[in-house]
Amino acid sequence: MMEIDLQKTFTWKIENFSGRKFPITSTVFSSGGCECYVLIRPKGDGFEDYLSLYLCVGNPKSLQPGWKRRASLHFIVLNQSGKEVHRTSERYGLFGPEIPGWGFRTALPLTKLQDRELLENNTLFIEVYIKVTEVVHEGDETRKDMLDFKGFNVLSSQIASVSPIFAKYPKFADDIKPTSKAVKTVYLKILLGLIKTVNKPPEIFSETELIKAYSSLIDLMEVGFRVKWLKSKLDEISLARKKKVDADAARVQELEGKVKNQVELDKEKTKSHVEPKMLSFKDYASPVSPWIPRRKRSD
């Protein structure tokens, strides 16, 4: 898949890594108009065999009410020589008041860091690649339009969109892990955005949109939403897009073949007009009437 073009935003050097047991944080840096930092859990976050990596907003309370940032993110782990040890996948997600940080719970298998030759001098470098795709500041004016619906804060204008989902899939939100109504509402917004996306015709989907859609789907599934129907829909879109891309490629190849044949044909025609015709001896010799000697006239 094609990746979104991300920029290296920050590099963090971590010394004496194997001796780290507790969560550690980087210095603060700026991205998307926010102060950010990287959080590492050397012994994992629910998965003891993995290193966990997160990007967090440094001082979310200093931002305007209703702030949010949509961003794409990945991390690269390097050793002291600059050799790449591991690269995470690219994720696309939302930062906001209820979700000031997110990242990768299973960013890197710890077995990779047990190799002393790979982990030189017990030192790691973490490179952070970010692209902020949306910056929003929202005030409190929409709060009065919020309604409680099935444990979620929903805008009155969204009820018509949310009701059919609960009617068709009544248990789809039964297992979600967040208990805060505000956090649940953020994920519901992600769900509604994803549903709107997958309802677009497959032929107008870009690869970037598909990457973002799958990233949103992963976020929803990780917090417990039962959204297999959305995964099936996305898989159908992905397959339809692949068939279209393959068909377009075959058509391009066919046209290229026709163009090549036409070029060769034009060359042959040009050659036949330019090259002189080879003439035989007969073509050069003019016809001569046979000479017949005259007989003398007898008197």
Curated annotation (Swiss-Prot):
SMART domains, alphabetized: MATH
The keyword Membrane is assigned to this record: no
InterPro entries on file: MATH-CC_domain_protein, MATH/TRAF_dom, TRAF-like
Pfam family for this entry, one: MATH_2
Coiled coil start-end: 225-262
Domain annotation MATH: ranges: 7-130
Cited CDD domains: MATH
Swiss-Prot/TrEMBL keywords: Coiled coil
Protein's UniProt name: MATH domain and coiled-coil domain-containing protein At2g42460
Native source species: Arabidopsis thaliana (Mouse-ear cress)
